[in-house]
Regions:
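Transmembrane beta-barrel strands of outer-membrane/channel proteins
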Residues: 44-53, 84-90, 126-134, 170-174, ...
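Hydrophobic, lipid-facing positions within transmembrane beta-strands of outer-membrane proteins
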Residues: 66-74, 105-111, 132, 150-156, ...
């Protein structure tokens, strides 16, 4: 009896660690935007993350920029069907030789709600997250809120387990990960060639996960990495939309240091980066920037 309980608990731990490896990008999310398409982690948790981007140059020698990203996520799993949360994304943008209609402090506050259903080998998830995305001089004053500062992020994703090692997911998502709001199809094929490996090929994200040990997981992922903010100048008499779009190739290593604590370190490369922004003189520009490297660290505590 005692051995059976031990085996059951061991299997449960392995299952949880497997889930964590699949959901690592959720925990260490240093994206300027919100990824509502990603399956939420199957545990209540509080996580914080910091990412530092190296300085990069705009095309045509228009200027230089660097960015710091911060994220905070609080998630509560009510039961097998409902997951609620609240989150915050913050980007500190420093731009040289260009005067923008923003102070460079960009925030996105969001409240995600996930409904999950599963029967036999099929699953369905509906996720929705109202969000406020704007510069700090807007978010701190409710009188400055407008419809342009609000976002509604949604995802409807179906899943089917074709075999023990092969799964299929498909659906639609609507968010700002490509910059301006887009509704786009989601499709993915999940293949587990070995108990320690998982290959997920799809759109808009693909990833390779490897369980190094029972407490150490490695993930390589490529995904869109953009967002949009409603911004105002210092005197609040000018406003515009600030749009950023890019792709991110990132490797992350996660260490489950304790049953309730997980540490993650990562290094990534952003490319195909484009900014659409309004200058202080009302000129609207769209410029690309050179690829940039970023490093990050995150800490998650599981309730």
């Amino acid at each position: 009896m005692r051995d059976a309980i031990i085996r059951k608990n061991a299997n449960l731990v392995r299952t949880c660690l497997s889930c964590l490896s699949l959901c690592l990008p959720c925990i260490s999310n240093g994206s300027p935007g919100v990824d509502i398409c990603q399956e939420p982690i199957a545990e209540s948790n509080l996580s914080i993350a910091y990412y530092d981007n190296e300085k990069t140059s705009f095309e045509r020698n228009l200027g230089e920029t660097n960015r710091d990203n911060f994220s905070t996520d609080l998630q509560f799993k009510m039961n097998d069907n409902w997951i609620f949360g609240v989150g915050h994304r913050s980007a500190i943008l420093d731009v040289e030789r260009l005067e923008l209609q923003t102070n460079g402090y960009l925030h996105t506050f969001f409240v995600p709600v996930h409904r999950l259903d599963q029967s036999d080998n099929k699953s369905f998830r509906f996720s929705i997250a109202p969000a406020l995305s704007a510069s700090s001089n807007v978010t701190k004053d409710p009188n400055e809120y407008t419809a342009d500062a609000l976002q509604l992020l949604v995802a409807l994703v179906w899943g089917e387990q074709i075999s023990d090692r092969l799964g299929l997911s498909y659906g639609i998502c609507g968010d700002h990960r490509f910059g301006e709001y887009q509704v786009y199809p989601v499709i993915g094929i999940n293949w587990q060639p070995h108990a320690d490996w998982l290959i997920e090929l799809g759109f808009p994200a693909s990833r390779l996960s490897y369980e190094v040990t029972k407490s150490l997981t490695s993930v390589l992922q490529i995904a869109p990495n953009g967002n949009e903010w409603y911004v105002k100048n210092k005197s609040l008499d000018k406003h515009s939309q600030f749009v950023y779009e890019a792709y991110l190739l990132e490797w992350a290593l996660s260490w489950r240091a304790h049953q309730k604590i997980m540490l993650t370190a990562s290094v990534g490369r952003e490319f195909h980066s484009r900014y659409e922004m309004t200058l202080l003189n009302e000129t609207r520009i769209r410029v690309s920037s050179d690829p940039t490297t970023r490093v990050g660290v995150s800490l998650a505590w599981f309730c």
